[in-house]
Amino acid sequence: MPGAFTKTCSALHLPGYIKNYELAIKKGISKIVCVAVNDPNVMKAWGENQNAGSKIFMAGDPFLKFTKAIGAEVDKSEKGLGIRSNRYTMLVENGEVKKVEEEKETATCELSSAESFLKSI
């Protein structure tokens, strides 16, 4: 996700996966990981703020190592956010990427929303 505590991430994207956790498990998903370009302490606080509990593993990517490795970095400097991750949802099975839904804009959460993604798998 683009960033902890940001508008779309906090209002739609992360809450959607928390709300649909049971459906994800029923569809065979064993772990939901939320990755954002923030440090681990911010991710922990955001998870607590969103009541993610043990449903979502909150993973910080402060140096963009993962984000750059998958080619998801996007420059949001004009909004004062610097380099961030694009908004996407990825299905990984046994270390292999099976499906990716990536938004054209970080403010959009349609293809990558829990509801849309879970319907598509």
Ranges and model annotations:
Residues 1-121:
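Chalcogenol-based redox active-site neighborhoods
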